[in-house]
Amino acid sequence: MKKSEFTENPAPVELEGTVLRICFDTEEVDQVINNGEEGQEPATRKVYLAYVIRVNNPFTLENVTKALLKEGFDEFKAVAVAAESLLTANEAGLLPGNALELARQMQIARISEYDASDAVNQFSFDDVPMWLDKDTRNGLIARLNAEKAVGKTTSTLWLGTQSFTITPDAGLQLLSALEVYASECYDKTAEHKTAIVALNDVDAIKSYDFTQGYPAHLEF
């Protein structure tokens, strides 16, 4: 989805008759309006770029989320933006709604989005950042154990077109450490979600720092 351009900072939510316009991920940029042609000095102007969706009534979390999914955003992003937009509209008096529940839905989706990002799902091997999901880890464990059983002393692992040579024992040790790391991250994510559900104040939920407490990235 391409961002739309505005000459002024757009409101995050706005009613256009019976349609709710939602602007998000807004950024301010300097746009070149000439290239110093004909002896002129280069000039720029401030513009705002934002993703824009428009949703017809009823303005429910489900409907707004569906509109975002249709535009290609993933589920966590869609729910987070939908809940935040409806919460903003509620706080501005534009729409009714359960502010507390919307705040919880927003933060829980953000936590899930963060948990799935490189901020959590990343380690480095020989200074190369990478990640192995659980299915891949399990497959590698089976492979390395099999290679160890038949007496192989080295194994070649691939990340795209890049290869890494490692001994089966070192590979199994790496995967064990990675499994512990992934488990600790899972526990921390669950802890944050539980904390959000327990909060009964919208401002406290909105200001909750769900990035805290995760283990440091592993380096091998």
List where the protein language model places each region.
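Protein-protein interaction/assembly regions in multi-subunit complexes
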Residues: 49-53
